[in-house]
Amino acid sequence: GESGEWATTVVDSAGGQERLQFDWVVDASGQGEAVTRLLGLPSGDLHGLKTNTVAVFSHFDGVKSWDALLAEERQDTKDFPFPADTSAQHHVLEEGWLWCLRFDHSVTSAGLVLDAHSLADGWQQIPAEKMWRTHIASYPSLNRMFQDAQLSVMPNRFIKTQRLQRIAGQATGQGWVSLPHTVGFIDPLHSTGIAHSMSGVERLADIFLSADRAHQAGVDAYGEQVLGELRLIDLLVAGCYLALPSKRHFEAYCMLYFAA
């Protein structure tokens, strides 16, 4: 764009002001979608996305050791590359999956990601705690792991999200561009967000550092790529949720993700 296409005033803690002008804004605000909100641009159409999931989560104290539970059941863990309790645990369920992240100070972050297609009508009205306890109680091993757990001081409540998926109507515009996580989010399954964001940073750096001054064309092409990539991730993730009731089919479909 033309020099000084964007302008802002920065106010420091002492009240001093500095006016800045710049050619490009890179929106790295994620779910905040700062630029699209500032410009009043519409969100994308979620009806085109096949993945439809919600999460119920919190932080807990006193979650039992999964390694100890496996040992009690005499499960063979000699092929495990590391102890289960020191890794990011993913417990695959028929209607979704559970993450379990044990921090060094004994607090555990745990959450259910559930396929909304498998939930009963009216799930939006079910309290978060009831949803959590109902699903955990359906799996005896998980019920044992959480039977003595208490909510941590923070946030000290169960949190239920609305639909996790979001996608922007556009990823770029005149003088602005969004990083992939700002453009959209599909699902925490497979943890695609970090790698996708890093690839966006790398591609935009190549565009802006190139000798070619026609940055807008390169940025627009990048934006179309990112929107297409989000829709591909949607297909990969949605297929995994469809296959979840069958361990064999779920594992086979996951291979498409690893091949991609």
Feature roles, as predicted:
Residues 244, 248-260:
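C-terminal auxiliary extensions adjacent to catalytic cores
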Residues 18-20, 218, 237, 253:
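A general marker of short, structured functional hotspots
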Residues 1-144, 201:
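Predominantly flavin-linked oxidoreductase catalytic cores and closely associated redox partners
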Residues 88-90, 236-237, 255-260:
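Short, highly charged low-complexity linear segments
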Residues 94-98, 104-106, 116-238:
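FAD/FMN-dependent oxidoreductases across multiple families
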Residues 39, 104, 190-194, 255-260:
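Short secondary-structure transition/capping segments
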Residues 27, 61-64, 215-218, 246-247:
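Poly-acidic low-complexity segments
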